[in-house]
Design a protein with these regions (language model features):
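Conserved S-adenosyl-L-methionine
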Residues: 1-79
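C-terminal catalytic and target-recognition region of SAM-dependent MTase-like enzymes
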Residues: 75-167
Length: 167
């Protein structure tokens, strides 16, 4: 959709005493230039097995004005296919369950292994990014993923691990 976060609404920083409207306008013009040069965005596919999660994400996308840029599906990881709009290799970005609250402490190794199998079968040549709370689980998807980012959502340590998807 190529829409900057917060565009189309006033930002709190605009009321700061040190705010410089000229600099703000310059940054906005540069973003518009980049957007024009970037061309069409890659296809975006949002999938979850829970219809409520998909509906909630869709409502958020609607409020952000990007709902039409996303292909929406409900389904299991084992049935995951690339976006129907094609577009060639892209990025498979996933936030699979971490355990604890979502799986009541169940064993997630099979789920992560299934994600790895589907990635190899359906997304070979793509890149993958996986947000995990346990790096060992990510090895079920693909050994050797590299740490791209460490963060603490909700006070829990997590890592975004990335790498190529090989067959």
């Amino acid at each position: 959709a190529r829409v900057a976060a917060g565009s189309g609404r006033p930002m709190a920083l605009q009321s700061w005493p040190c705010f410089e409207p000229g600099t703000w306008a310059s940054v906005g013009a540069e973003a518009d230039r980049w957007r024009a040069e970037a061309g069409e965005p890659p296809p975006i596919l949002a999938v979850d097995r829970d219809e409520g999660a998909v509906a909630s994400a869709r409502a958020n996308a609607e409020r952000a004005g990007v709902v039409e840029a996303i292909e929406w599906r409900t389904g299991a990881i084992s049935d995951l296919l690339p976006p129907s709009s094609g577009g060639g290799p892209g990025l498979l970005l996933t936030n699979p369950p971490w355990g604890g609250r979502l799986s009541a402490g169940g064993d997630l190794r099979n789920l992560y292994a299934t994600l790895g199998r589907v990635a190899r079968e359906q997304f070979a040549g793509w890149r993958i990014g996986v947000l995990v709370a346990e790096r060992a689980l990510a090895r079920q998807i693909r050994p050797g993923l590299s740490e791209a980012l460490q963060l603490e959502p909700g006070g829990r340590r997590a890592w975004l691990l990335t790498g190529p998807v090989d067959r």
